[in-house]
Amino acid sequence: MAEEKNEELQTEETEQTKEDGHGDSAEQEETENNSGTEVEEQEEPEVHPLEIELNELKDRLARVRADYENFRRRTKEEKEAQAKYRAQGFIEKLLPALDNFERALLVEPKHEEAKQLLQGMEMVYRQVEEALKQEGVEPIPTEGELFDPHLHQAVMQVSEEGYEPNQIVEELQKGYKLKDRVIRHSMVKVNQ
């Protein structure tokens, strides 16, 4: 009987060990499962509100920098354009006087004194033209050219032999450009 009790005790111990071992493996599995969840949770890090704010501030800073660079570029371009065309207002005011000079030079003098006066006016006119040329002002070419609405203003249309359609027949008032900008369009007669 003592042997039977020993066997029963051993059987119970073995069963308990199996249960304990089984229990251990369940705990191990649970621990493994929990650690797997923790790994998954670690893969998706929690974004801290301060990090979000930092990223937003970095984005705003980048936009402000870009805006500032655009502002600097625009300001520089405007200053360059101002310097390039600084004389435009003065030249626009000078053009009517230049037109009157040209008309005066077309008059045929009858007296010797008038001829000398005309020669002096021609010298002054050439000096004014040269000064304008040095500032980048040049007359717009017209006669024989094809009509260009960006450069010319058609005042009359005529039908003349020897001219192509849209070819300028006569210049009625001289036009001028300051560098690449038209100050005043040429007034012209255009062939139909």
Swiss-Prot record:
> Which stretches does the entry tag as region Disordered?
1-59
Subcellular compartments: Cytoplasm
Q: What is this protein called?
A: Protein GrpE
**Its biological function?**
Participates actively in the response to hyperosmotic and heat shock by preventing the aggregation of stress-denatured proteins, in association with DnaK and GrpE. It is the nucleotide exchange factor for DnaK and may function as a thermosensor. Unfolded proteins bind initially to DnaJ; upon interaction with the DnaJ-bound protein, DnaK hydrolyzes its bound ATP, resulting in the formation of a stable complex. GrpE releases ADP from DnaK; ATP binding to DnaK triggers the release of the substrate protein, thus completing the reaction cycle.
Q: Which family does it belong to?
A: Belongs to the GrpE family.
| Phylogenetic classification of the source organism | Bacteria, Bacillati, Bacillota, Bacilli, Bacillales
Q: Note the subunit structure.
A: Homodimer.
**Coiled-coil ranges (or none):** none
Location, primary (coarse class):
cytoplasm
Query: Could you tell me where the Acidic residues compositional bias lies?
Result: 1-14, 26-44
Q: Which CDD domains match?
A: GrpE
Query: For this protein, what is any one GO molecular function term?
Result: adenyl-nucleotide exchange factor activity
Q: Which UniProt keywords apply?
A: Chaperone, Cytoplasm, Stress response
GO CC, alphabetical: cytoplasm
Organism field: Shouchella clausii (strain KSM-K16)
- Which residue pairs form cystines in this protein? none
Compositional bias (Basic and acidic residues): 15-25, 45-59
